[in-house]
Amino acid sequence: MKNLNIYIFSMIAVGMLAFSCENAIQADEDGGNQTDTTSFENDHDSEKSEALKIADPENIKTKMIRTTLNAKSESKATGDITFEERTGQVVMEAKFKGLNKGTHAIHLHEIANCSSSDGKSAGGHWNPTGERHGKWGDAEGYHKGDIGNFEVGDDGIATVRFETAEWCIGCDDENKNIVGRSVIIHQGGDDFISQPSGDAGKRVGCAEISEYQEK
């Protein structure tokens, strides 16, 4: 009888020990999996957050210039122009009023000076690389200020949008920096052939490109 009691006690003890070990192993496995997953998710969320931060437009530096077109050569031209640089691209957006119907040339000129009544105080085309005048992107050459032509309707209103990586705002590259230049609107269209400026006629509007803001 005594031996039977010892045997039963031993079996109970062994069973309790096995149950305890099984629970301990299960707890360790559950705990291990939870820790790994949490750590992985935290790392992933951190990387994702950093990527979103970099991609967030609010974290990208922007340079902007706002300028106003003044009438020249007894025209009635007016307008507002903005230049915005972001991620290596400069976008020019403009809205003009008071222009005659038809084709007009728009160029960047070399000096930010619109003081003269005919706009000639702005100098010639901005051409820092010494190229021949031509249509933008022409393999035979073009000025950095050779934006091109735009059309004006019966209402005298026109909008212009131009985007390029060949300009910059306030950078150290004088072949790209548009600060210190002027926007000139001409009476007629640019033929992209006549030298040195395309035979576009009088300067009917001028806007100085000077101070810029960075945000």
Give residue spans per PLM region.
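Hydrophobic helical h-region of N-terminal Sec-dependent signal peptides
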Residues: 10-13
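N-terminal leader/targeting pre-sequences
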Residues: 22-103, 110-215
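C-terminal motif of bacterial Sec signal peptides marking the signal peptidase cleavage site
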Residues: 17-20
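Bacterial N-terminal signal peptides that target proteins for export
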Residues: 1-8
